[in-house]
């Protein structure tokens, strides 16, 4: 994996159609960052949240997580 690339983090579900959260260089932190974001905002959805990490160079989805 290339750690020098920039990755964007998006949260989606029926409430957040596509909420841009921010950019990180290391994609492994995406799930932890998403959990922290939701806790801080007190937006804990009743159902699962899909987290997408997107490579900003190619706009391809690098990884996805389900947060319940």
Residue ranges of predicted features:
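Aromatic side chains
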Residues: 7-10, 37, 65
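Surface-exposed loop/edge segments in extracytoplasmic proteins
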Residues: 16-22, 59-64
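A broad "ordered helical/assembly scaffold" signature
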Residues: 4, 20, 31-32, 53-54, ...
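Short, mixed-charge low-complexity intrinsically disordered segments
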Residues: 39-68
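Short aromatic-glycine-(Arg/Gly/Cys) micro-motifs in beta-strand/loop hairpins
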Residues: 1-20
């Amino acid at each position: 994996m290339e750690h020098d690339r920039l990755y964007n983090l998006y949260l989606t579900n029926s409430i957040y159609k596509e909420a841009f959260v921010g950019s990180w260089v290391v994609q492994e932190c995406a799930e932890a960052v998403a959990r922290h974001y939701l806790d801080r905002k007190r937006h804990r959805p009743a159902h699962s949240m899909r987290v997408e990490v997107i490579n900003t160079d190619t706009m391809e989805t690098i990884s996805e997580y389900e947060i319940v």
